[in-house]
Swiss-Prot record:
It is a single-pass type I membrane protein. The chain crosses the membrane at residues 166-186. Its main location: host cell. Residues 23-165 are extracellular. Residues 1-22 form the signal peptide. Glycans are attached at residues 65, 114. Disulfide bonds: none annotated. The lineage of its organism: Viruses, Varidnaviria, Bamfordvirae, Nucleocytoviricota, Pokkesviricetes. The gene is OPG172. This is Protein A43. It is found in: Host membrane; Host cell surface. It comes from Vaccinia virus (strain Western Reserve) (VACV). Induction: Expressed in the late phase of the viral replicative cycle. It comes from the Viruses. The keyword Cytoplasm does not apply. Belongs to the orthopoxvirus OPG172 protein family.
Amino acid sequence: MMMMKWIISILTMSIMPVLAYSSSIFRFHSEDVELCYGHLYFDRIYNVVNIKYNPHIPYRYNFINRTLTVDELDDNVFFTHGYFLKHKYGSLNPSLIVSLSGNLKYNDIQCSVNVSCLIKNLATSTSTILTSKHKTYSLHRSTCITIIGYDSIIWYKDINDKYNGIYDFTAICMLIASTLIVTIYVFKKIKMNS
C-alpha cells in the first residue's frame, strides 16, 4: 500500500511540468486575444475615407509604433492597421506584433465588415488569428461605428529553427529532474524503513 502511494506521487510529479507548460501557453492566448478588440470608426465625407481604430491595449504592454494603410476601390475599403508592443517590464525589443486587416463595403444605409486580426508573440513564437465575416452595421450621417468581435480563433506555434523546441526541451528537463528527485526520495525512505 505504501509503495502504491509512492508510485502515484512519482507519476504526479512527472506530469506536473508538462501541465504547467501547456497551461502557460493557454494563458498567453486567453490574455492576449483582447488586443484584437476595440472600435473601428469609418467616415466618408466629401469622397474622402477616414478610418480610425482605437485598440484596447492592456496595462502590461507599452506601445512602440503603429502603421495604417487604406485603399479604396468603388464601394470597398481595404485597410491594415498594425502596431508593435512590448511587455512593460521586458526587454527593449518588441515582443508582440498585432495586425488588424479588413474589408469594409458600404452603401447609403449600411456598411459590412470582414475583419481578421493576427497576434504574433516573438518571445514564445506563437501566433493567434481571429476572423470575423459579414458583420453589418448601420450608417449614421456617413459614419459607421463597428464593435469588433470574432467568429473563429486559431492558435498555432510558429516554426522557427533558432528557437524550435526550446520550450519542449525545458519541459522534458523539468520532467526528468522531478522524476529523479522523487525517485531518490522514495529509495531513501524505503532504505530508512527497512
